[in-house]
């Protein structure tokens, strides 16, 4: 049976290098499942695969969207499944790698009946965001869908806006639409989770932020100033440095805040993944054990 190997884990854990080794061993391309790496021009701040890595193994869904493009987990589900179907005509195994929780769920179990948002609703919500601010939209979401309000990151503009749009468009709750029965896939799914001891993970995150700064993250953010209102830039690493360029924060403070916010995001990812009992967990250094496990289960 065709098998989709899903390599997941928190940001900074070491998915990229292991995904390359796995893809080479399996002789397959990589489907990126990091929602921010889909956007072009966010190479440094999202730790997107380098040009050399992209040459080493074929990737899908890296740098394919413009910053102002609207994109959702439901659209990713459609695009990824189309790509998977095409690739499975040529091979029996594929690798999907990333840490975007909702995008992984979209491919593995589907997002049922999420309505297409009309231009009227999208424009209305966008205008309210500009006029009233995120807090007003968050309170509206609390009224319409208190369950999702309780779990959503209240500072994540994209998720609050999308959930509110769905509520307004469907007349129901985003929670109900997300929690319907999983869709059945015509391929097997093998989930591999990567994790490290908490202190080790946090040290890697801190070091990676320092490395991003040394490789020009501030210059990347400066180039993106004309697009700063794009949802894609409401992302750790970018929003903090915009405040530096605005003269609100010193650089040292912003760098420390990026590290802290990245660590918080990693904890949220792990909390989400821990609810999935189908994940087999490994330390990233256990590369041979991971490869053996995959080969045993895709044979």
Describe the role of every protein-language-model region.
Residues 1-299:
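Phosphate/pyrophosphate-binding catalytic cores of soluble transferases and nucleic-acid-acting enzymes
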């Amino acid at each position: 049976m065709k098998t989709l190997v899903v390599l997941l884990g928190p940001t900074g854990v070491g998915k990229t290098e292991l995904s390359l080794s796995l893809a080479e061993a399996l002789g397959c391309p990589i489907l990126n499942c990091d929602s921010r790496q889909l956007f072009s021009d966010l190479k440094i701040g999202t730790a997107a695969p380098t040009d050399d890595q992209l040459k080493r193994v074929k990737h899908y869904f890296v740098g394919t969207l413009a910053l102002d493009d609207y994109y959702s987990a439901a659209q990713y589900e459609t695009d990824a499944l189309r790509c998977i179907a095409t690739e499975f005509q040529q091979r029996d195994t594929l690798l999907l790698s990333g840490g975007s929780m909702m995008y992984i769920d979209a491919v593995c179990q589907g997002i049922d009946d999420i309505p297409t948002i009309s231009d009227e609703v999208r424009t209305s919500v966008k205008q309210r965001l500009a006029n009233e601010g995120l807090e007003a939209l968050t309170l509206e979401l609390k009224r319409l869908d208190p369950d999702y309000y309780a779990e959503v990151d209240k500072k994540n503009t994209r998720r609050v806006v999308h959930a509110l749009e769905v509520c307004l468009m469907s007349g129901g709750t985003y929670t109900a639409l997300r929690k319907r029965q999983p869709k059945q896939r015509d391929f097997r799914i093998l989930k591999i989770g990567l994790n490290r001891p908490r202190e080790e993970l946090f040290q890697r995150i801190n070091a990676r932020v320092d490395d991003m700064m040394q490789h020009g993250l501030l210059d990347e953010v400066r180039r993106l100033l004309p697009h700063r209102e794009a949802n894609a830039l409401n992302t750790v690493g970018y929003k903090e440095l915009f405040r530096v360029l605005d003269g609100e924060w010193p650089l040292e403070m912003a760098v420390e805040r990026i590290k802290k916010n990245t660590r918080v995001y990693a904890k949220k990812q792990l909390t989400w993944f821990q609810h999935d009992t189908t994940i087999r967990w490994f330390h990233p250094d256990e590369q041979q054990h991971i490869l053996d496990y995959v080969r045993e289960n895709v044979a």
